[in-house]
């Protein structure tokens, strides 16, 4: 990786665009801009690109990335940037999603069908999928569109509204009514309406709540999150691309550099340089941690909005109302990450092979209980989690015969009431492994090393405010033309020359590339 | 005579209002009530000899002034006496008084937090703005957005225009306000836990949401949506208890020639040729009318008093899915005298308003957590009010007219289980008792 990242700026270099942060959205944006002929520099604070998708050696010989699978990476982006030529396989076999059961049968959701449930549930799943796919298809075009500003009389903006209205209308009266009814329903109500099996309900609601401060009983945005995640062809099924998520990051880096973008690592940005005169403000460059300044026509931030405006720009350059709207963004993370180095493949009770995406949440109440603790700033007694063993799919992640277990653990509060300490981290890590051991009894003896990253750790290691996956909660008031706030929702900001291109913008988080793509389109407009 | 222009099922206050308006418009109406009393939740009942309770609903503010005027309810005996203030009992000796008098309210806020005292102006101004849009829609029929009927399209355009007129910034603030949690919204303004809890307590009662649930912020509109006699945001108790509202509506109905029958439960709505044509009562009587209006909830209407085969396809299933989740219980207590509360300078304020018992939003949320999981809360959110002598019904003795009622987060799964009922009563009482030096109270 590093040979392509070590081009040294001579101080006088001038770029068309500087992108702050080489997370996947920053790389997507860089690749599009470079492809269109811009001179682009990507500045990354850590020593490798990829952000939360970057692979790290957490124990000698064992590698993992915080994001451990992808589910709805935009196929448009993959083909535009010719990622296949750079090593990314879009058509990777999808993983079965397995809801683990302690005493009866595991529930497996794979390729549009169910096993391990009653035939009633299996039939209901067909109805459920048909309806959800219908709605997901209806919304799909909008994830790759720039959301218009309300009140705009621009024809293209009005067309976007008309398009959305038409798409909803085209579904027919019954579907339209049903969409309006369920769009803001808590995941729990939706699942209860369709299914009986508790594990199935917990497993399917998982994708509605993970990543945000939400649980199955929370109304408003869980169903939209589910639909967002079903937008691409895999219909929300997860996959591990060749080389893991890091493989995708590498293909993006390769595509960007092939088009002429420079990626500089170990180059953390301290400040965005703002020029002010009688005509207003203008972002004209950045200052690195070591004092070096680099000039560019525009600065594009792939870091989260709070960090961008409050740390890199500084409130002295912002209008107070705007500052307040950025300050009140809700971006406290509630997902922790567990990486375990194992001396063999863990054996889960009555599961042939742990090669799927495994959910440990016996029912929706278990998820809700874990959330109840976390929302009060406490550690959950019984954490719930999503597990992947990436080394099953990519042997290079661990020494021969050994394995990496990667788990998203919910709900672990960013703001722990007593404050985060090493012993608090150990405590929640122990509880998580206890849960694991209930389903994989021999796992404790297999553990060589474990690493538990709380949201605070994620914030520190990955420079993402609140340790939040999505840079800001996926909630109604932080979506669409309100993400991150209305003056910065079209990828530009109140400061001319400063743009946003990552998960803090429409359409939001997860590894999709959509925000990076949309931002590049707006910049090139 | 068993032939009318309109039959209204259920003499709750909406049924009464509907019947009164139809009667006033010249229709020959009959209002059918299953109980032997009218008013539904808006009733005054003598549950204990000599004590008249507002046995279910307990305070009035949201009743629309237009109805008051149109039906001339004052002439039919309705007089709402405003609260002068309310008191929130926090943990220990913490107390927060909210007064309708602005200066007193400001001074009291300052005692808790000077910052919050300043923020209150912003809070009130913002809420009042949000309420304006809703106020405009309250007396209109919501449109069916899937319909192409001119009336629906016109109404939809009306809503769109009202929203559009707000301007960009306001639209976003509205979306935010109506979708975030009460706790998140209050955090934007206040720092004192007690103040925040007191503010949230006005509306959270009766919802199946916690103060941390997305979308619960709208409950704060209870501070500004209603009014007493035009005084925005005021709360009050009707003279004679909540039943006085129903009595005045019934009087208006009868004045306009409408008929009111109690002990007349409807067994089934009669449908002929896909049109409702009347009802069959529980006693077997048949009443016919061109219009049948149900004041029962949608679920009861479609799943209990209608034959599934009479309904268009899908309606039964939808009504069955309709979510109705009770979250509050109520205790009515007859006291031999005014209890003395700790931490109050005197009983002036509680004589003139409501009481809430909650120390923080977190406490309220924890009570909701218990409800969610079907458990009783050890520390339920409790709200009450006294019937003060000044608004006692004139036929009761002056000395003993006081009462507490409490609503609290509690599981609805076990409603009706006598022993459990006592358990929740005592949980609620114990939470009050820590603030009360009770004098010979009896339940």
Regions found by a protein language model. Name each.
Chain A
Residues 92, 265-267:
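Short loop/edge segments at beta-strand edges and connector loops
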Residues 8-151, 471:
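N-terminal glycine-rich phosphate/pyrophosphate-binding loop and immediately adjacent elements
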Residues 343-461:
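C-terminal segments that line or cap access tunnels to active or ligand-binding sites in enzymes
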Residues 197, 201-216, 380-388, 442-506:
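A glycine-rich dinucleotide-binding beta-alpha-beta segment and adjacent secondary-structure elements
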Residues 503-524:
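A conserved FAD-binding loop/helix module that cradles the flavin
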Residues 133-259, 464-479:
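Active-site/ligand-binding neighborhood in enzyme catalytic cores
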Residues 1-17, 35-36, 479-481, 485-486, ...:
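Extreme N-terminal leader/targeting segments of oxidoreductases
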Residues 13, 240-242, 261, 268-399:
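Mid-domain catalytic core of redox enzymes
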């Amino acid at each position: 990786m590093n040979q392509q990242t070590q081009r040294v700026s001579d101080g006088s270099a001038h770029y068309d665009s500087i992108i702050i942060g080489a997370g996947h959205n920053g790389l997507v944006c860089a690749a599009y801009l470079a492809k269109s002929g811009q001179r682009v520099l990507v500045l990354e604070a850590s020593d490798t690109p990829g952000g939360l998708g970057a692979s790290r050696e957490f124990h000698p010989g064992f590698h993992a990335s915080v994001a451990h699978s992808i589910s709805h990476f935009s196929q448009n982006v993959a083909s535009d940037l010719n990622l296949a030529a750079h090593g990314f396989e879009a058509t990777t076999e999808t993983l079965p999603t397995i809801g683990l059961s302690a005493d009866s049968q595991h529930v497996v959701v794979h390729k549009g069908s169910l096993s391990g449930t009653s035939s009633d549930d299996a039939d209901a799943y067909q109805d459920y999928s048909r309806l959800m796919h219908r709605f997901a298809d209806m919304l799909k075009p909008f994830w790759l569109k720039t959301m218009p500003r309300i009140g705009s009389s621009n024809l293209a903006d009005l067309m976007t509204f008309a398009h959305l209205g038409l798409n909803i209308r085209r579904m027919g009266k019954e579907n339209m009514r049903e969409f309006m009814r369920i769009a803001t329903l808590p995941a729990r109500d939706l699942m209860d309406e369709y299914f009986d099996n508790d594990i199935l309900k917990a497993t399917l609601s998982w994708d509605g709540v993970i990543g945000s401060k939400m649980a199955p009983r929370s109304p408003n945005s869980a169903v939209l999150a589910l639909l967002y995640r079903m937008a691409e062809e895999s219909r929300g099924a997860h996959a591990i691309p060749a080389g893991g998520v890091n493989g995708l990051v590498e293909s993006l880096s390769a595509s960007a550099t092939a088009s002429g973008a420079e990626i500089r690592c170990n180059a953390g940005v301290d400040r965005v340089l703002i020029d002010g005169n009688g005509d207003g403000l203008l972002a004209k460059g950045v200052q690195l941690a070591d004092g070096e300044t680099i000039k560019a026509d525009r600065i594009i931030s792939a870091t989260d909005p709070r960090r961008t405006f409050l740390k890199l720009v500084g409130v002295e350059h912002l209008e107070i109302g705007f500052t307040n709207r950025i300050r009140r963004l809700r971006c406290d993370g509630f997902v922790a990450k567990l990486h375990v180095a194992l001396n063999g493949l863990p054996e889960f009770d009555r599961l042939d092979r742990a090669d799927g995406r495994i959910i440990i949440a016996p029912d929706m109440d278990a998820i809700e209980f874990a959330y109840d603790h976390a929302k009060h700033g406490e550690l959950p007694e019984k954490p719930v989690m999503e597990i992947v063993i990436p080394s099953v799919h990519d042997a290079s992640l661990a020494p021969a015969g050994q394995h990496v277990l990667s788990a998203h653990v919910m709900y672990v509060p960013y703001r722990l009431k007593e404050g985060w300490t090493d012993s608090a981290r150990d405590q929640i890590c122990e509880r998580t492994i206890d849960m694991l051991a209930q389903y994989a009894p021999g796992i404790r003896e297999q553990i060589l090393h474990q690493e538990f990253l709380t949201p605070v750790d994620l914030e520190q290691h990955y420079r993402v405010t609140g340790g939040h996956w999505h840079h800001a909660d996926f909630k109604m008031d932080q979506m669409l033309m309100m993400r991150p706030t209305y003056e910065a929702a079209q990828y530009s900001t109140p400061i001319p020359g400063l743009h946003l291109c990552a998960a803090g913008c429409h359409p939001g988080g997860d590894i999709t590339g959509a925000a990076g793509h949309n931002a590049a389109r707006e910049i090139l407009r | 005579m068993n032939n009318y222009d309109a039959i209204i099922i259920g003499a709750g206050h909406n049924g009464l209002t509907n019947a009164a308006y139809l009667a006033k418009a010249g229709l020959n109406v009959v209002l059918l009530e299953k109980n032997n009393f009218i008013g539904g939740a808006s009733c005054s009942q003598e549950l204990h000899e000599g004590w008249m309770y507002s046995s279910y609903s307990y305070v009035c503010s949201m009743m629309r002034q237009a109805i008051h005027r149109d039906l001339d309810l004052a002439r039919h005996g309705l007089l709402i006496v405003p609260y002068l203030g309310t008191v929130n009992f926090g943990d220990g000796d913490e107390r927060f008084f909210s007064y309708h008098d602005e200066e007193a309210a400001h001074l009291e806020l300052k005692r808790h937090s000077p910052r919050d005292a300043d923020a209150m102006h912003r809070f009130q101004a913002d809420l009042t703005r949000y309420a304006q849009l809703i106020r405009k829609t309250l007396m209109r029929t919501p449109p069916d957005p899937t319909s192409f009927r001119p009336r629906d399209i016109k109404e939809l355009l009306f809503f769109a225009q009202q929203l559009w007129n707000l301007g960009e910034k306001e639209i976003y603030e509205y979306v935010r306000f109506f979708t975030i949690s009460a706790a998140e919204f209050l955090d934007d303004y206040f720092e004192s836990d007690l103040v925040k809890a007191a503010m949230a307590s006005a509306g959270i009662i009766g919802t199946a949401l916690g103060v941390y649930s997305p979308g619960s912020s709208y409950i704060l509109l209870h501070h500004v949506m209603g009014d007493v006699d035009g005084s925005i945001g005021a709360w009050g108790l009707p003279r004679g208890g909540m039943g006085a509202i129903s009595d005045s509506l019934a009087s208006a109905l009868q004045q306009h020639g409408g008929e009111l029958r109690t002990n007349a439960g409807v067994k089934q709505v009669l449908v002929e040729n896909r049109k409702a044509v009347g009802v069959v009562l529980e006693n077997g009587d048949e009443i016919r009318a061109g219009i049948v209006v149900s004041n029962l909830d949608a679920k009861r209407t479609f799943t209990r008093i209608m034959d599934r085969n009479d309904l268009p396809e899908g309606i039964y299933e939808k009504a069955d899915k309709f979510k109705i989740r009770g979250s509050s219980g109520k205790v009515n207590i007859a006291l031999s005298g005014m209890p003395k509360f700790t931490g109050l300078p005197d009983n002036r304020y509680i004589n003139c308003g409501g009481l809430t018992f909650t120390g923080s939003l977190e406490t309220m949320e924890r009570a909701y957590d218990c409800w969610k999981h079907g458990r009783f809360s050890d520390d339920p959110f409790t709200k009450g009010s006294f019937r003060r002598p000044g608004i006692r019904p004139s036929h009761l003795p002056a000395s003993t007219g006081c009462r507490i009622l409490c609503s609290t987060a509690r599981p609805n799964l076990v409603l009706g289980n006598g022993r459990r009922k006592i358990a929740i009563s005592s949980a609620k009482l114990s939470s009050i008792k820590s603030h009360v030096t009770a004098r010979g109270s009896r339940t």
